[in-house]
């Protein structure tokens, strides 16, 4: 009888353990279906700036390690060749060129993404994710230009477009106000020293870079770029500001601030699914890396900033590993647009470039409709699901919205991500074709099917003298065979009118939507 009872208890315990194990396995499976997601977006870093893409002069071992465990793309694209429209399209899945107010945002610009617009962050939050935005923002704040309450709660802001937590730069490193904004309030602001910002006229008594070069103790501006106004941290910027002395950032600590906040976000949310956008400031101007990177590249501040970016990647990967969630975290590493070497500060970037080619084999760079303007680095890593490799699939950042929604098993609501398409299999390395075509903007519009690229006529300048970049604008139609002429040297429009007509029709159809 006793043995029967024991056997009965044992059977019950075994059944209970089996049920518990089954529940645990179901929970693990459930968690595996909902990976953490990180968008890690560099600033002005080109395809050729990374050693995994062939750089022999700059070594980025952490990015290499990420590429070795994921899919490295050779034909990935941002939607635009500058920051604001690129990030707008990334978050909204909407072509920035459909609106006329998505150009490079001033430091006091109103928020480009309106609260009523669905975003990828909204989608993740609706799926039960905790969402965060850290670092470079450059999408404006408040409801109109100049409408920010810099000394109070700034609204609308990231929380109005899907982000539970935010720690962002108000604009860019070279534009005032040079402060951190955490959850829509300026960090370390002394109420007795309120901030004032203007993009119209200077404040009396506040020194300007153009008048007081002796105060520019760190970097001096290149002529005619506009970086000669308010002086912050020994560097002159675009725009005017006064006050907020206690809240001003130190440029050498920007990467540390962004990285530490990202690591802390990971630590705080390791037990729940999260979506984290990290926008680095590297390698945007002004380039003033932390002392531990200074001189390490042999290429001056820009090269050192690339090493600093690689460090950020390594710290984020390390935080995921320490938290035990690296296996089930999907990381998308990319850049907002192509590279620029001289973008307004006398940091000897051109002089010290040597044999380094930030643009890789492509023509142009930031601001350009040629390939180097929008053909950017991209790596997708998800150790639990993604088989390492290299993909030549044609992919665009605009499709990350719809593709992540597909990953979540959540159909996009009406009006959400109107230009975003589900190419999840391409991002995960399973589909080696990707998109049928990509449409991009930089002064003029272009459309490419991966082999042929058409650039619409434009009255814009063909060459930017200040940045030494070919912009790609021409009054003539342009057609390039990217398979045979990756450097876009020979315009074949006159020789292949039928291909021009085909691609032009695609572009006109997109414009009519």
Residue ranges with predicted function:
Residues 2-13, 17-478, 486-512:
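Formylglycine-dependent sulfatase
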């Amino acid at each position: 009888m006793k043995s029967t009872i024991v056997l009965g208890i044992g059977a019950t315990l075994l059944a209970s353990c089996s049920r518990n194990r089954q529940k645990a396995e179901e929970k693990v499976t459930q968690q595996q279906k909902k990976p953490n997601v990180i968008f890690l977006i560099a600033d002005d870093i080109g395809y050729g700036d990374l050693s995994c893409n062939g750089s022999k002069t700059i070594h980025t071992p952490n990015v290499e390690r990420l590429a070795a465990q994921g899919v490295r793309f050779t034909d990935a694209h941002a939607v635009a060749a500058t920051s604001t429209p690129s990030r707008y399209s990334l978050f909204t899945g909407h072509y920035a060129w459909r609106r006329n107010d998505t150009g490079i945002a001033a430091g006091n610009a109103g928020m480009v993404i309106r609260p009523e617009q669905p975003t990828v962050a909204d989608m993740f939050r609706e799926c039960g994710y905790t969402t965060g935005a850290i670092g470079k923002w450059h999408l404006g704040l408040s409801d109109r230009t100049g409408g920010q309450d810099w000394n109070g709660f700034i609204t609308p802001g990231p929380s109005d477009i899907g982000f539970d937590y935010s720690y962002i730069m108000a604009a860019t490193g070279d534009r005032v106000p040079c402060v951190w904004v955490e959850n829509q309030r300026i960090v370390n602001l002394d109420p007795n020293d309120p901030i004032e910002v203007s993009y119209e006229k200077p404040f009396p008594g506040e020194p300007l870079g153009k008048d007081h070069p002796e105060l520019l103790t760190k970097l001096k501006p290149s002529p005619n770029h506009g970086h000669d106004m308010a002086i912050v941290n020994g560097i002159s910027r675009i725009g005017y500001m006064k006050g907020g002395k206690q809240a001003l950032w130190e440029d050498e600590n920007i990467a540390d601030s962004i990285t530490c906040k990202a690591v802390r976000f990971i630590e705080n949310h390791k037990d729940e699914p999260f979506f984290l956008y990290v926008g680095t400031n590297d390698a945007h101007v002004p380039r003033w890396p932390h002392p531990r990177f200074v001189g390490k590249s042999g290429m001056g501040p820009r090269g050192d900033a690339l090493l600093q970016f690689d460090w950020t990647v390594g710290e984020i990967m390390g935080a995921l590993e320490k938290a035990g969630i690296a296996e089930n975290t999907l990381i998308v590493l990319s850049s907002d647009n192509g590279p620029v070497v001289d973008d307004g500060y006398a940091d000897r970037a051109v002089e010290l470039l040597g044999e380094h080619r930030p643009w890789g084999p492509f023509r142009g760079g930031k601001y350009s409709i040629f390939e180097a303007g929008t053909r950017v680095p991209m790596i997708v890593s998800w150790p639990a699901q993604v088989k390492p490799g290299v993909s030549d699939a044609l992919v665009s950042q605009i499709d990350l919205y719809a593709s992540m929604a597909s990953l979540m098993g959540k159909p996009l609501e009406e009006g959400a991500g109107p230009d975003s398409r589900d190419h999840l299999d391409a991002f995960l390395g399973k589909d080696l074709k990707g998109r049928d075509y990509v449409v991009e903007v930089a002064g003029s519009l272009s459309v490419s099917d991966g082999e042929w690229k058409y650039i619409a006529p434009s009255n814009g300048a063909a060459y930017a003298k200040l940045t030494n970049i070919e912009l790609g604008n021409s009054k003539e139609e342009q057609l390039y065979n990217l398979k045979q002429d990756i450097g876009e040297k020979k315009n074949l429009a006159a020789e292949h009118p039928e291909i021009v007509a085909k691609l032009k029709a695609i572009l006109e159809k997109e414009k009519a939507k």
